[in-house]
């Protein structure tokens, strides 16, 4: 007997965004400010690739992305925005949507946080344990409605043109820390490329990943760390600054690996300040040159597009695919 077809819709825009002129404007904005929407767009592209891969393996799956209201399927995942989630809730009230999932990786402003608890939302899907714990620290009742599922990363193969060069990925960190690290690398005569968030393109990043051996990652916090995963899938280990806490407006939360929720010993190591950076970096760099890290193998097993898409289906739909 043929397996029942699974039909689902991925939403990132509300119904007003289907007009061609608005979509054209949004595409221009994406090109100009890609780094500010990299997360949601990256998640959408990952699920698209992952679902396509599962279909090729024989899973009876049909899905669409931001369709007109007449083509929305009964199962819906909202990937971006409180307005889009509100729109989806209105469709569920009209019985157009039967199962509604907020996520994965949806961000909701503090003043609209209550929309997560709307009875029409069947489940909230967050990208990491770090995000799960953070939201539970703010509201104890939310844990029963949350599940964890990361977004995957595309496998584009690895390069044979690597040099003894580092990427220093500077996203959000104190200037004093980044200055000390760059000065250290210069004194040790270690070649590096500095990438500052918002000042390069995805193509620039992919090019440098293919040319480099490892990455120093400077960021206060990550919900998941897709940029890290893109390095790992290329077999680049990461030396990540982790300051142990997150501060957002009046909220303070502490925990381990806030900057790198999916970092493992196969993928690299953390440091907490410059003193620890200076102490541990020689060992990290030598292990890198000796090939003692294996981030690509870990990423292929746990964080590929297909693996994460399959996790999402298993998690949210309670079906073992």
Stretches with model-predicted labels:
Residues 73-108, 125:
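Active-site proximal beta-strand in glycosyltransferases
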Residues 201-212, 233:
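Short acidic alpha-helix that forms the nucleotide-activated donor recognition element
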Residues 207-223:
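Acidic donor-binding loop of glycosyltransferase active sites
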Residues 220-302:
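Catalytic binding pocket for nucleotide-activated donors in carbohydrate/polymer assembly enzymes
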């Amino acid at each position: 007997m043929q397996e029942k077809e699974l039909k689902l819709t991925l939403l990132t825009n509300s119904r007003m965004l289907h007009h061609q002129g608005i979509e054209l404007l949004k595409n221009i904005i994406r090109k100009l400010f890609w780094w500010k929407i990299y997360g949601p767009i990256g998640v959408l592209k990952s699920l698209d690739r992952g679902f396509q891969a599962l279909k090729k393996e024989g899973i009876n799956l049909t899905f669409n992305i931001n369709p007109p209201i007449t083509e929305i399927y009964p199962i819906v995942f909202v990937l971006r925005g409180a307005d889009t989630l509100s729109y989806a809730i209105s469709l569920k009230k009209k019985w157009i949507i039967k199962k509604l999932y907020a996520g994965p990786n949806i961000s909701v402003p503090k003043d609209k946080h209550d929309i997560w608890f709307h009875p029409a939302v069947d489940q909230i899907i967050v990208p990491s344990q770090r995000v799960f714990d953070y939201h539970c620290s703010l509201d104890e009742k939310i844990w029963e409605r949350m599940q964890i599922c990361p977004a995957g990363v595309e496998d584009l193969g690895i390069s044979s043109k690597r040099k003894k060069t580092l990427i220093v990925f500077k996203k959000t960190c104190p200037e004093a820390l980044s200055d000390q690290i760059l000065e250290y690398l210069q004194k040790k005569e270690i070649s590096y490329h500095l990438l500052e968030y918002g000042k390069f393109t995805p193509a620039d990043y992919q090019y440098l990943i293919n040319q480099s051996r490892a990455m120093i990652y400077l960021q206060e916090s990550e919900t998941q760390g897709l940029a890290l995963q893109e390095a790992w899938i290329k077999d680049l280990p990461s030396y990540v600054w982790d300051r142990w806490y997150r501060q957002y407006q009046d909220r303070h939360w502490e925990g381990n690996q806030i900057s790198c929720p999916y970092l493992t010993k196969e993928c690299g190591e953390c440091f907490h300040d410059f003193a620890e950076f200076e102490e541990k970096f020689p060992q990290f760099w030598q292990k890198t040159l000796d090939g003692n890290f294996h981030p690509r193998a870990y990423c292929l097993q746990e964080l590929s597009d297909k693996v994460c898409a399959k996790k999402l289906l298993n998690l949210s739909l309670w079906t073992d695919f």
